[in-house]
Amino acid sequence: LGLPEVPRMAGCITWYHSTPFSPSATGRLVVDGQNRGPVINTLVISNISKEYAPAGQNLISTTTDLSATESDVRRHLSILWGTSTHDWQLIAKYEIPAALPIQGIGRALTQNVKVSDQLYVVGDHRTVPSQQGALFSGRLAAELILNEGR
């Protein structure tokens, strides 16, 4: 069919900790620009909506690579949030072995979504690996189809 090759995938773990005290008053995503540990990003998700957290608690969402251990995650979170994580409770952990396509060095940020006259391929593997990338590639395909009068 002449389809584009399937990209290699990267995995991740999403960790959810509850805590009685919020380490931040914002809903901003925190990343470590110094690359000191396994945490890719973290945020106080209950600062976006209190309903996400157990009653009377705050909910921290954290994404790591697949090799992370809970002790490494807690150590890194303590650095990023500037507080002890000793009283944080792990309430869920989700391992996602094929979470995102690997972008790769030298790969164009946007791949053509039209692969033949009647075939369009969309997904975050065609643009930036993210939910936004998946939506963007779908929009590109929809616009192409509408502009072609199909």
Question: Where in this protein do the model-derived segments appear?
Answer:
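Mid-domain catalytic core of redox enzymes
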Residues: 1-80
